[in-house]
């Protein structure tokens, strides 16, 4: 199928993939008076007395803002906020279909960090959470940090944390299959953008001790000149042996490769130098760092990509709907590491021990109960970690 052509036809036909639906009627004088004036003054006054009543008397409790500036849309790059709208509408659709979450696209005509932060902060009272989407690095880190500091609702950059959650879930199961432990393996990553940095932070937080990140220049190590603040933070937390050189240099004897970078970055020759039963997560889209058949011929035991036409797809839709569902159900003030780790464990646990194999380390997006399972784990973690407000 020509997906580009068919999708364009669909978008012309629909003129938008989402819409507002009424939850009550206004078809006679009485129903109109209850839904709007004069009756609506009563809930307004309740919220005036206690702003938290906005979660009980409006749809705020179930509504998320999907925010972009259009600077890093898919693999298209900086195409502008309006051009990013089809993706944001699609994201909102997935929120609803997979998590029952009402989501509103907000495409902001600014690239200024503080302007974006202030805009979202001023609108935050209308929402139960904020999902940042397709904002270029390293600005995305600063925008998320500043919003988390100012907002009392969860702020979550899915390109970072959703990807990291799925990677962790997949890696936990992959390591089970090959009989290795996270704290013992050497992990080499390619790509130091939003996803790459978030993946490493989450892996380190759960006990990964031997991690080396690479970018276009090569291995990132403490003392390498020219590192931006985000990379410097990674340099201080990883690569304790201070390995230097190219990806080809540092991948020798690695147990795990995680790529969120560019097509063809990992070669068959590099895979051959990895440890026995190597795990390769090649998640550049749409063309991975190495194709699964090449990686397996070179000796990889388990290969995962971001594509649906190969086994073990790393697909963010497994995570973000359930994560937000759980956060909203807990009325959480944050989505913290405990909640992300709980989501990863929940996803990993959906593949039973009897079903685990080299070609089956993650559930599928359409498997029954994915969103509900993740949501329950996230809500429980929110309560346990003290960020729940219900």
What are these model-derived regions, one by one?
Residues 158, 178, 282-390:
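Adenosine-phosphate binding glycine-rich loop
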Residues 1-155, 375, 381, 385-389:
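N-terminal ligand-binding/catalytic initiation module
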Residues 74, 79-96, 157, 165-262, ...:
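Glycine-rich phosphate/diphosphate-binding loop of Rossmann-like nucleotide-binding domains
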Residues 232-302, 307-309:
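Rossmann-like adenosine-cofactor binding region
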Residues 105, 131-134, 155-158, 189, ...:
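General beta-strand structural signal in soluble alpha/beta enzymes
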Residues 69-71, 79, 108-109, 134-137, ...:
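Short, ordered loop/turn segments at secondary-structure junctions
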Residues 12, 55-60, 96-97, 122-124, ...:
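Solvent-exposed alpha-helices and their adjacent loops that cap or buttress functional pockets
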């Amino acid at each position: 199928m020509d997906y580009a052509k068919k999708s364009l036809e669909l978008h012309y036909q629909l003129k938008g993939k989402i819409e507002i639906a009424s939850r009550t009627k206004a078809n006679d004088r009485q129903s109109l008076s209850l839904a709007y004036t004069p009756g609506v003054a009563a809930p307004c006054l309740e919220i005036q007395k206690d702003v938290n009543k906005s979660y009980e008397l409006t749809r705020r409790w179930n509504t998320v803002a999907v925010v972009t500036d259009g600077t890093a849309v898919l693999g298209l790059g900086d195409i502008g906020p309006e051009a990013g709208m089809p993706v944001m509408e699609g994201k909102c659709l997935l929120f609803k279909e997979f998590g029952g979450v009402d989501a509103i696209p907000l495409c902001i005509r600014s690239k200024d960090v503080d302007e974006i932060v202030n805009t979202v902060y001023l609108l935050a009272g209308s929402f139960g959470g904020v999902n940042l989407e397709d904002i270029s690095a390293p600005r995305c880190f600063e925008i998320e940090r500043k919003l988390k500091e100012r907002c009392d609702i969860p702020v979550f950059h899915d390109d970072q944390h959703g990807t990291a959650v799925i990677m962790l879930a997949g890696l936990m199961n992959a390591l089970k299959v090959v009989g290795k432990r996270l704290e013992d393996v050497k992990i080499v990553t390619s790509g130091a953008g939003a996803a790459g940095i978030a993946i490493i932070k989450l892996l380190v937080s759960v006990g990964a001790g031997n991690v080396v990140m690479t970018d276009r220049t090569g291995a990132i190590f403490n003392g390498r000149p020219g590192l931006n603040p985000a990379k410097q933070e990674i340099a201080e937390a990883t690569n304790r042996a201070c390995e230097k050189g190219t990806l080809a240099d540092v991948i020798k004897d690695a147990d795990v490769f995680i790529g969120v970078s560019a097509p063809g970055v990992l070669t068959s020759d590099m895979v051959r130098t990895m440890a026995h039963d190597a795990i390769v997560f090649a998640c550049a889209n749409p063309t991975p760092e190495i194709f699964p058949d090449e990686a397996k011929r070179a000796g990889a035991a388990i290969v995962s990509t971001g594509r649906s036409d190969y086994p073990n797809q790393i697909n963010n839709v497994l995570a973000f709907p359930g994560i937000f569902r759980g956060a909203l159900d807990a009325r959480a003030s944050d989505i913290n590491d405990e909640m992300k780790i709980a989501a990863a464990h929940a996803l990993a646990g959906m593949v039973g021990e009897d079903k685990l194999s080299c070609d089956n380390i993650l559930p599928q997006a359409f498997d029954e109960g994915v969103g509900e399972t993740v949501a329950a784990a996230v809500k429980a973690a929110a309560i346990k970690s003290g960020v729940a407000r219900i």
